[in-house]
Regions:
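Short Gly/charged-rich anion-binding patches and loops
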Residues: 21, 63, 115
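C-terminal subdomain of the subtilisin-like protease fold in secreted/lumenal serine endopeptidases
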Residues: 4, 38-42, 106-167
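Short, function-defining helix-loop hinge/capping sites that tune catalysis or transport
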Residues: 21, 97-99, 146, 162
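Extracellular S/T/G-rich loop segment that most often corresponds to the catalytic His/Ser-adjacent loop
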Residues: 4-6, 24-106, 110, 151-157
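A short beta-strand-to-loop transition that corresponds to the Sensor-1 phosphate-sensing loop
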Residues: 12-14, 46
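Active-site environment of divalent metal-dependent phosphoester hydrolases
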Residues: 15-20
Length: 167
């Protein structure tokens, strides 16, 4: 994907695991080493609230292996037979991030996939709070320790940063 300037947006998974200690595929590094692709972005899921329970209990996390978090719980979504329902999972968070990436690339087509990944990671909102990781109330960590960027994707900030980068 990287050779063809494609950003791969990956759902982190829904086992409530620390991906820095459990091997899950696909990923973008070997044995927690350096990234082998700068166009692979892994996304964890957030609840629709701020505070200690903002990370969805089911969401995988990891300071090395998860890049960003985005809303992924209690998402109103389409379902088969022209219906709608509330869904949750990192597979709901990843499309939200892919949508922001598509918005950036549509407005700023000169940016590469690697630049868009950097924008998404750098422009997000940092939470200055401790959160429950993996749904285990005995596992409380600073939000910044659950993801490489320490941030939640923010479309507004991403577009501002992308406009500056595209100049």
């Amino acid at each position: 994907a990287g050779k063809h300037d494609v950003l791969f947006v990956n759902a982190a998974g829904n086992e409530g695991e620390d991906l820095d200690t459990v091997a899950v595929y696909p990923n973008d590094q070997v044995d927690n080493g350096p990234e082998v692709s700068d166009t692979f972005l892994t996304v964890g899921a957030l609840e629709p609230k701020y505070g200690s329970n903002m990370v969805a209990g089911f969401s995988n996390y990891g300071k090395i292996n998860v890049d960003v978090f985005a809303p992924g719980a209690k998402v109103y979504s389409s379902t088969p037979e022209n219906e709608y329902d509330t869904k949750g999972g990192t597979s709901m968070a990843a499309p939200a991030v892919a949508g922001v990436a598509a918005l950036i690339r549509s407005y700023y087509p000169s940016l590469t996939a690697a630049q868009v990944k950097r924008v998404l990671m750098d422009s997000g909102l940092a939470a200055q709070t401790k959160v429950v990781a993996g749904g285990d109330t005995n596992n409380v960590k600073p939000f910044g320790d659950l993801t490489k960027s320490g941030k939640m994707v923010n479309a507004y900030n991403a577009l501002i940063m992308a406009s500056q980068m595209a100049k």
